[in-house]
Design a protein with these regions (language model features):
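Conserved Nudix-box catalytic region and its N-terminal flanking loop in Nudix hydrolases
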Residues: 4, 46-56, 62-69, 73, ...
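Short clusters of small/polar residues that mark proteolytic maturation junctions
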Residues: 99, 113-114, 137, 186, ...
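Nudix hydrolase/Nudix homology domain
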Residues: 2-8, 20, 25, 29-34, ...
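Short glycine/serine/proline-enriched coil/turn segments at secondary-structure junctions
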Residues: 92, 141, 188-191
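Unchanged
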Residues: 110, 119-122, 127, 153-239, ...
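Acidic, metal-coordinating catalytic segment for phosphate/diphosphate chemistry
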Residues: 81-122, 128
């Protein structure tokens, strides 16, 4: 009889564990459904709030004119949004996702989900022999190894020039005799405020790299012309590498042209 009671008790315990797992699975499904609904609501608000047939504003025909940048175009006032509120929707190790309520130019309200990022630096490291330093690393978001120029995120308040020197040493083991600013790009301004400051490093000397504990990197030195060819035929997809390679190539051609004229 005691053995039968033990068996029954074991069955009851297993049944209880099964029920608990079922409850947990149901809760996860409910959480996923809620999160999906939130995302759908966010996307709906982000794209449009209302019937497109009722739209009373149109872009109009393109205008041939000189390039106008910054806040110098008076027409910009007709497309600007006014932030009404901003709350942190999610906090991560590297960036946050904030949810903004905004007023559209026509007075309607919409929701914008924005990734708040501290920014980053990227370095076009050019050797005296005309080779570019590239790092090969696995990018989890893409699920594959990518080929990029060295780069890294800024810490809040960090000087980008100092960060560029630090990242170059950490990822490649190189120090630079000169680091010059090239440009700043917005990595994906449709939903993220990250700015990447791109520098060119020359006068390189090799030391010892010290990547972060979770960074596994291989470093290559390739001909600048070969990198530019890979950019132009679409084999390089990384935005900062595309911009950095083309800028470096343009500068090199201009310098060579100036030297030939002299």
């Amino acid at each position: 009889m005691a053995d039968i009671q033990k068996v029954n008790g074991a069955h009851d315990e297993q049944a209880g564990e099964t029920d608990e797992l079922a409850v947990q699975a149901s809760l996860r499904e409910d959480e996923l459904a809620d999160a999906t609904a939130d995302m759908r609501d966010s996307v709906a608000s982000f794209t449009f709030d209302g019937d497109r047939d009722d739209v009373d504003h149109v872009s109009g025909a393109p205008v041939e004119r000189e390039l106008v940048l910054g806040s110098e175009d008076p027409r910009d006032a007709s497309v600007e949004e006014r932030p009404l509120s901003e709350d942190v929707a999610w906090t991560g190790r590297i960036f946050n996702v904030n949810r903004l309520q905004v007023e559209l130019p026509d007075g309607r309200h919409a929701v914008r989900d924005v990734v708040r990022h501290p920014g980053a630096v990227a370095i076009v490291a050019l050797t005296d022999e005309g080779r570019i330093c590239l790092v090969r690393q696995y990018r989890t978001a893409l699920g594959r190894v990518t080929v990029e120029i060295p780069a890294g995120k800024l810490t809040p308040g960090e000087d980008p020039l100092e960060a560029a020197s630090r990242e170059l040493l950490e990822e490649t083991g190189m120090t630079a005799g000169k680091i010059a600013f090239l440009t700043t790009i917005a990595s994906s301004d449709g939903f993220c405020d990250e700015l990447i400051h791109i520098y060119m490093a020359t006068g390189l000397e090799f030391s010892k790299s010290s990547p972060d504990a979770d960074e596994f990197i291989n470093v290559d030195l390739v001909e600048l012309s070969e990198l530019v060819d890979a950019v132009l035929d679409g084999r390089i997809e990384d935005a900062k590498t595309v911009v950095g390679a083309l800028l470096c190539d343009s500068i090199s051609h201009r310098l060579n042209f100036s030297q030939e004229e002299e």
